[in-house]
């Protein structure tokens, strides 16, 4: 929707004669609905269709695009499932463009992590890998306006100290703002996803009957953020990084003192609290509350993959809710890839548990919407992956080491076949990352792996035309063999250094090939 400068009211955009509403080509290779969804998706992500714009009425679109209602509705459902559209019902409703944010990705990944028995200790390790370096980088890039924003966010923390949900929301906003200032979109997305999950555990700790412990945690956060602001004002990146590391260490120790560090995370209390405070909006509050309840039951293991829900009639009676509101709640879960709906009340619905591949799809959409380049993605890889590899080497098991030896031999056999080499390399990475024995770090590696899989066809197609690519493959295989040797000695420092060296070599490859400056959106197609 567009905004009227006189009234501030939201008005739907109108179909014009431009390319936005051109009729769809008729091709036999793909369904027209999928072509339309892909076309609109590209226009949303490139800004041709802006956030909060309302698409023209269904009748206008079908006429303009020369398609059926069923085809249009299927295309819009695809975009809704990708969090790029919101379908509003009732008078004044319609399809409204959305800018995908971190909320949906965070919620999905949190559910995935809880089902993998992730603990608070695992999340602490994730933060220690990602955040301190980003905090130091942020200080070097922060201007006066940025510092004022951080001060305002810090003031919000102070004012919300006695409100557990408000306080957790405020500290999450401050921490995310610091990471955003580091200037790497990929890092900001990944850190933001896991920070929201960590915040859920902080909420559980401070929203308790132990008022003294809750007050200690709140005060420690406020003092730590004040110290970081002092370092930022001095433009001291080293001090800022140390301050952030101390912040993570001290707050984590307070939580450890309450003997929760090794317990599996439980995100359900925060979800229920957030749903209970949902305001008025296009989605009924009862629908949001019910969707949160189903989400929580999946997280708690009460609903498992493939479980069938009761009929609409039985569910409506169980929750004392109207069928339209119930259907809206189920649609929310369907759009989050947590439910398979069937036509008709008797068909029921079945539960889908989350996967890292779907999480990567959701994260990829957010990266695309932010205009992330492949160079940005690769810089995040250079910062995150060596520490993970170092931890994996220090925790390697004989079985995993044997798998690494085998895949190293396969890499040596296919250095002249770039397409096969890249595919084998991705498999080798997954074996290495799985050795870290931290489900949260493994999920990060898997998400980045699946994003790379998305751009792999474009990378492979161009790489095969470069005359020196076989030499690059041989060098990568040599370094991987050195990593395996370091892992055999459980040499975490050596393994991390070898991995960093390999990534540095790849960085020059991307610069030479021109991939670095291309958008993730364009590479993923």
Language-model segments: what does each one mean?
Residues 41, 45, 135-139, 151-158, ...:
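Regular secondary-structure segments
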Residues 127-133, 137-207, 242-252, 377, ...:
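Conserved amphipathic alpha-helical segments that form helical-bundle/coiled-coil interaction surfaces
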Residues 23, 70-73, 77, 81-84, ...:
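Extended, hydrophobic interaction surfaces within ordered domains
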Residues 1-125, 264-380, 524-525:
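Short linear motifs at protein or domain termini
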Residues 336, 437-438, 450, 466-470:
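Intrinsically disordered, low-complexity segments enriched in Gly and acidic/Ser/Thr residues
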Residues 31, 125, 165, 216-220, ...:
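Short helix-capping and inter-helix turn/linker motifs at the boundaries of alpha-helical repeat units
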Residues 11-15, 201-282, 301, 454-525:
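C-terminal all-alpha effector/ligand-binding and dimerization domain
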